[in-house]
Amino acid sequence: MSDALPLLLRAARGEQVERPPVWMMRQAGRYMKIYRDLRDKYPSFRERSENPDLSYEISMQPYNAFQPDGVILFSDILTPLPGMGIDFDIIESKGPQINDPIRNLAQVEALRPLVPAETMPFVGEVLGRLRSSVGNNATVLGFVGAPWTLAAYVVEGKSSKNYAVIKAMAFREPEMLHKLLNHFAESIATYLRYQIDSGAQVVQMFDSWAGELSPADYDTFAAPYQRKVVELVKQTHPDTPMILYISGSAGVLERMGRTGVDFISLDWTVDMADGCARLPHHLGVQGNVDPGLLFGTPEAIRVRIDDTVRKARGRRHILNLGHGILPGTPEENGAAFFEAGKTVMDRIGARV
């Protein structure tokens, strides 16, 4: 086991590294047969993600198979909700279901402050075990959902195509929505601090549905609360790198760069060179290979990785997909992605 700090952590902190570190969003999941076999045995997603033995085992599956530079906690962005008094389930093929969607002020005011050590001790246990297992051979990543995206789920009650319910709240009862978003910002910051204290070395905030907002509404309902989370976490953990990801972020990329995070994770609809040009140079970039490319050939994967790394040259860069890996992706192409990422400098030359 190496004594040097892991590659991804060094890169995230801005050190000169020999190659871009590589991991994949949703790298533990349905494209892996070993995961599907475990899912058949334990069909409840909440059991898989909240039983510490199962969560740890699933988190380690891609590490054991592919040795990525990052090992991310197997969990869900909705996992902290019950600790605030919001029950949920995740139905296979349907996605999240909120049992009692939040639609009035009384429900917002009844939400509890999040105390992760009491309501989610399994998260801390898994992160600690991951750190012990991978040592300095990989970086342990934690993650959360951002306030707007959590609010979208709990107000809509499920995934949505047009977000009409939460947008109605935003434009008819904005004070109520701001109260909900503020509660989530404070709770999510508490949750991130807990993850870092438990072993997470780098953390990512997913605002998956902020791309559904106009730039002006992003400035009103998403960015201030992303910024609040970052500020609260940085007060106590200033040296922990933070990554922000939004799906469909092309219209708000510059705005993302003003939230205080250290890295912007680009989706694949933004050319890496364009993304780098649009963001301040002090910010790192993550991404951004189209996950659909992993249905192609290993050669196509190599070519795209080479192109992505070339375009990010001169920046702090973490190689990743532009979205989570898709179910049904050939497992051997997941392996090809990691192999091509680790050998990219042999093909394009020079240090990053």
UniProtKB/Swiss-Prot annotation:
Write down what this protein is called: Uroporphyrinogen decarboxylase
Report the Gene3D superfamilies cross-referenced here. 3.20.20.210
Question: Which pathway does the record list?
Answer: Porphyrin-containing compound metabolism; protoporphyrin-IX biosynthesis; coproporphyrinogen-III from 5-aminolevulinate: step 4/4
Superkingdom is Bacteria
Gene Ontology CC: one annotated term: cytoplasm
List its EC numbers. 4.1.1.37
Annotated GO molecular function terms are: uroporphyrinogen decarboxylase activity
**How is the subunit organization of this protein annotated in UniProt?**
Homodimer.
Biological process annotations from GO: protoporphyrinogen IX biosynthetic process
Q: Which InterPro entries match?
A: UROD/MetE-like_sf, Uroporphyrinogen_deCO2ase_HemE, Uroporphyrinogen_deCOase
Q: What class of enzyme is it?
A: lyase
Which residues are involved in binding substrate? R26, Q27, A28, G29, R30, D76, Y153, S208, H323
Q: Which reaction does it catalyse?
A: uroporphyrinogen III + 4 H(+) = coproporphyrinogen III + 4 CO2
The feature of type site (Transition state stabilizer) is located at: D76
Similarity section = Belongs to the uroporphyrinogen decarboxylase family.
Cystine crosslinks: none
Q: What does this protein do?
A: Catalyzes the decarboxylation of four acetate groups of uroporphyrinogen-III to yield coproporphyrinogen-III.
Quick check: keyword Repeat in the entry?
A: no
Question: Where found?
Answer: Cytoplasm
Keywords of the record: Cytoplasm, Decarboxylase, Lyase, Porphyrin biosynthesis
